[in-house]
């Protein structure tokens, strides 16, 4: 009760409505760090400094301050009215009040009257202020418009004076002006000399003794004095007299139509005449050019159009220019799609097509590229056809033309071989002639003859593709899948029996080394586009290759191919000396035909293989196929999981066949492991040789089978059927652009969580292929960035736009926040979250806070209620930052309150990293 008496105690000489808010409120001690409003009467030195720096824009600012003061008065009177109403209610209920409270209740009607009067006064002053501000703004606009018009008129007058002075520099204009009776009265000879001197002062002529800037500055002073019309002397007269003379000349009308000088008119006529004469000559030359180049029509097969360079008529090409053109084309246009091109050989060598390497799954349908570029205009196209015809006549090029003499030899064997080669070239990626697999098993000699057709007429042919037939060759092109790497098997080696070949394991780069006999002929086949190192395989003859292949199938190395295969660093190294040195012999091959058949069948992307006995090997191929040129070698392939098509299904889970007695299944049963990456999905092979199905999942580690050579483990998402997962089963992705080539590999755990793991090297030990090797998977390290800073001292700069520094740091993960400058430096590109809360000092100046990214304002905060109270300005933002960006807070205007309770804070953290 004593406290209430203190709050409502009135001064005998003052009324309630005239009291200030500080006099009506008694503050109690809230603690050490609580903000306390100061009285406006007792201004500190800081507040006086801020008030002195505050700039008032105009009279409307004073009116706004008066309205704010009146608003606070009304609010205080309303509070007093509510207090008196409570006292009246207590008095009606019979409660006792002291003398001061009874006196205050007696003045209730006066307080209500004062409140009503104050509200009406506020409304009236507000409307008058709006009218006054509108009138003031209108007057300011009119004044500004008048100043603009005046400046425009002065500028126009200056340009007119400048034009008159420049025109008087011409002698013909001066003579014409003085000799004309109508204008001779405007100016005497003395006035003309004075104007000439004035023209030199205003810069009509360049004075090279001084700089251009100094000359124009002096001319500007002369123009200013001239437009003002002062009585200062200049050029034997005054500025006022000169201005009057110049205005008379401008108003005379003589300078409205001044004839051009004769020299300029003559130059214009001379420039027009050569243009009119040059036009008919250009037309005649164009007619001559078009008449000389009348092409003759000729049928050309664009699929096998030779690469020729467009040359001018009558120019002969050297015999080896086509090599330079071919190499330049390869460097300019790398092989990115399936294309067919043909290089033309001299008549001494036969045609041998060249095919660009098959690359990735860019498209499953092969396409051809027109080598002869077409133009948009008909005359140019005709000229190009004419040039192509002349080049074909000058160079011995093998072009397929109708009704041409047959180049086939008379020997029936060679004639048959060349016809089959021509059929393969015409068929392209489609196979119109199919062969039986049974014939190959029964007659290996015939099969080898069909597979390997040496190119007649040349011992070093240009290899376009392997002239081999496998089960993948028989299927149509519409069912081709993503091509794998080339098959280094005996069938391909037999076709390349002459000379040493270099085959790239990654991009199918085929070229032939020069032989001394071919160097004598003076013609070499150009190498195709090369991207990496090649795999050198020495092939002496067909029998050696067949014997070596049979020994490789039995696990015995061949001494004839003891060379090292060198590949790019990203590939795994392959040694042909003993590629199966750590693999147990699990099957035997009896007879040359069965070994050839198993080797010739190739490894297609969707192949399914099962070895049912130790004496026979059966091969089953699916509907899709891979071109035979890009089948990977057997040494590079490792069967990770089998997906047989026709197998029994057991009730307890999948059962896989081994060399003893194995039964597989073609579908998943309940509890079988599905999804996940390959090593997680495939079934585990026990050391005994049988397969076990995994019915549980353990994301902590995975089991991998040992490889026969160094291998970099890759992970893929497991999805789809067995045919779709066949590329993952063979673990060969050298020709396919996939996420496995990147640094991080997505790993699907099957539990709706995705981990990103780096590529790992699995150490290989000389042990059997059935050994299980645990490899632990760890996620990538997440970048930890977060900070939280506070300010414990007041901050009131005397100027605008000052950075805010923070003297207390709660958190600084990553050490990217600098307390001295208050700036956060972005360590990595990503999305960041920033939050700030700034408390305004209890003064009448509003608070403006800007969140800055480098020098750009991202978000802002404002705090002001029109009274000297504490207010908080806060905001937040989610920003996309790049590495090196700086984020900081800027105090645009106002002052910040700081205490040990840390009211002003600035925080931020990394949301996600790009």
Swiss-Prot record:
InterPro entries on file: C1q_dom, Caprin, Caprin-1_C, Caprin-1_dimer, Tumour_necrosis_fac-like_dom
Topology versus the membrane: Peripheral membrane protein
Oligomer status and interactors: Homotrimer; via C1q domain.
Signal peptide: none
Keywords for this protein: Calcium, Cell membrane, Cytoplasm, Differentiation, Growth regulation, Membrane, Metal-binding, Protein synthesis inhibitor, RNA-binding
PANTHER family, per the entry: CAPRIN-2, GPI-ANCHORED PROTEIN P137
Deleted gene: phenotype: Morpholino knockdown results in a dorsalized phenotype, with enlargement of the telencephalon and reduction of the tail at 24 hours post-fertilization. Expression of the dorsal marker goosecoid is expanded, whereas expression of the ventral markers eve1 and tbx6 is reduced. In addition, expression of the telencephalon marker opl and the midbrain/hindbrain boundary marker pax2.1 is expanded posteriorly.
Domain C1q: 780-914
Biased composition (Low complexity): 610-626
Gene responsible for this protein: caprin2
Binding residues annotated for Ca(2+) 2, in chain numbering: 871
Protein name in the entry: Caprin-2
Compositional bias per record (Basic and acidic residues), positions renumbered to this chain: 264-273, 370-392, 508-520
An annotated Gene Ontology molecular function: RNA binding
GO biological process: cell differentiation; dorsal/ventral axis specification; dorsal/ventral pattern formation; negative regulation of translation; positive regulation of canonical Wnt signaling pathway; positive regulation of dendrite morphogenesis; positive regulation of dendritic spine morphogenesis; positive regulation of Wnt signaling pathway
UniProt cross-references to Gene3D superfamilies, sorted A to Z: 2.60.120.40
Polar residues composition-biased segments: 274-283, 469-480, 718-738
Function per UniProt: Promotes phosphorylation of the Wnt coreceptor LRP6, leading to increased activity of the canonical Wnt signaling pathway. Facilitates constitutive LRP6 phosphorylation by CDK14/CCNY during G2/M stage of the cell cycle, which may potentiate cells for Wnt signaling. May regulate the transport and translation of mRNAs, modulating for instance the expression of proteins involved in synaptic plasticity in neurons. Involved in regulation of growth as erythroblasts shift from a highly proliferative state towards their terminal phase of differentiation. May be involved in apoptosis.
